[in-house]
């Protein structure tokens, strides 16, 4: 099998990529330079296009780089009819000045902002008001802050400053997750690991005239979902988010798994749900919605991790064009401070009778986002959207992140690249540490587009490492004994010129494959624990 290697400088290669551009609609769903974790997705009216709606993603912003989150909320949205085309709506909120316009902090940066929530309320005059619920994590006197706007994309202005202290807000002092029911009544949910009032979920009715205090006479319901420190299967950790589905109330939350659950160590890397006939409970545990570890059963019957070994994730459910998705975030790199927004499709079944069950399937970690038919093989894809990456030794999170095989690393660019958000110079995410015995995979490609075609080639942009190695290309699964089909192979040698190279791999056998299938690379080398290459991009060509 003859493999062609095309040499070139990084500048020339980027110029070539610019002719095609990195594909949209992959998972992560936003440009690969952007880091919006803790996403709360909502379908709201598009204020600039009457009669149209958009999906808005309200989340934190991982700009600190060496700590969770940042000092602004930056909003992204997509048209409901095409949820693959995300647009940066800019910074919608900062907590910088007090009620009198004076700086809140000596540094001038303002409050560090963690996971927010948002709601829309129809006011007495029939106009819609949008509320943002920031989490000023380091400013206890501003916990429970509420900001208001006439548009879903802001800007949002604080509406609950204290009448006596310009640096405080009027609230009952917790970080809030909120929900407005069809009848206009509003509810609030709170609970975080110790230090923020409660480590299980409490709930109460909210006063809609303030959106920051409890309704007079409201009863606080404690332990509506129990914590991981209590008995039971709920095992709530943090991040409550309420949704209503066919008359049932579904509470999504970050769950701390038990030791040995799923055959793995205890971690807080899953989203789960509980459901009820009432917004105030009682709630019944439903199951797992997503597990960042991408767990699967190996040929030996043991559970193995095929993605990150742990790390937090937050998110919620959203119906988009009649299909339900769980929005969550994944981890990149060797810390938890560059988290990327992801989606996974789920199936929802509701028994709408009193006490009826809500069944929601667990989503698979994949690379396709809203492209449910699979990625277009003829488009250019960043290698870092890989959803499957394993090494010869299982990855670990403690005492620090360590991978014996590939993993995606974050790419940062200064400022916002909103004007050319998907440009090849910024929309980049590479896969590093491709060692002997490791596997990288992308689920899924739409190989119906390549079926029956002759002369197919796979173009792989990479940087050679300092050891010789072989990369085998598989579809379906990464090994023959698992049902995989090997369709190509190429060598990477240490005497290749440095810098970016494009390897052209004949893959004639792919013509016999049809439908939505996974693509895998397996790596082998006589030298252990050394990277054969760093993967940048891949695409197919006739």
Where are these regions (language model features)?
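Bacterial N-terminal signal peptides
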Residues: 10-21
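Carbohydrate-active catalytic/glycan-binding domains of CAZyme proteins
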Residues: 24-542
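Bacterial N-terminal signal peptides that target proteins for export
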Residues: 1-12
